[in-house]
Amino acid sequence: GSCTASLTGSAVVTVTNDPTSTISANTICSGQTGTLTFTGTPGAEVLFTDGVSNFTVTLDASGNATFTTVALTADTTYTLISATTVTPPATASLTASATVVVVGLPTATISGTTSICSGSTTTISFSGTAGAVVTYTINAGANQTITLDASGNATLTTPALTADTTYALVSVALGSCSQNQTGSALVTILPLPTASISGTTTICSGTTTTISFSGTANATVTYTVDSGAPQTIVLDAAGNATLTTPILTAPSTYALVSVASMSVPVCTST
């Protein structure tokens, strides 16, 4: 005959999902570090590369992780390679990527070094990154700002200056990116020339006398005789000049009109 026995038992096949991860990156200013953000299977070890070196991060219990890059000066792409879990043991190939976008730092320069006559104005020019805000000082005073236009230029007209004045760059900023800047423009002030006249006297009709001028060395003095046409005389290196009048038979007035320096630019006083 045949024998029959009843049996019991089972086999359980557990199917687990492959580990996963996503990657994202931020935008930074040149010279800063970037931040990569990973999200995926809790506990997974994520392998990724920048095309030169490989790196790993482990996702926390919430499935998140961040990674700080080295300081970057150019856009850099990071690509996922794989995600691996220990329990259960599994590895999945990944291909997603994210790029840390690097924004170049703004720049600025300053120009306008010149010499002007005391009491005059001049123009200081700035150039650099379009739209940037340039911070500068005047004679190391409080910070002031000027914004570059769409062409990357800006100018300012100084007030009337009577002493040497230095306009110096401090920094430049555009959005969240900024850096210190160096450079300056020196406005040198040339003193106004001076002149005086002497020689008031009484003489006998038909005689001559001497008129004396003094003032800034080498300056050109303009004067009139009895309100006539302007005439000039040049002071010597000691700042002096004299002239002998013609024979006079009536009172005569010698009057100063102006004095001009030999400097560049020429400075004039009246």
Outline where the language-model segments fall.
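Short, exposed coil/turn segments at beta-strand boundaries within extracellular/luminal domains
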Residues: S2-L7, C29, V86-T95, C117, ...
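Solvent-exposed segments in extracellular or luminal domains encompassing
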Residues: L59-Y78, T147-Y167, V234-Y254
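Interdomain boundary/hinge segments at the C-termini of tandem beta-sandwich modules
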Residues: A11-N17, A98-G104, A185-P191
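Solvent-exposed loop segments of extracellular immunoglobulin-like
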Residues: P42-L47, A130-Y136, A217-Y223
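Proline-enriched interdomain boundary motifs that mark the N-terminal boundary
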Residues: N17-A25, G104-G112, P191-G199
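A short beta-strand segment in extracellular, disulfide-stabilized domains
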Residues: Q32-T39, T121-S127, T208-S214
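Conserved structural position at the C-terminal beta-strand
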Residues: S82-A83, S171-V172, S258-V259
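Short, solvent-exposed loop/linker segments at the N-terminal edge
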Residues: N26-Q32, T114-S120, T201-T207
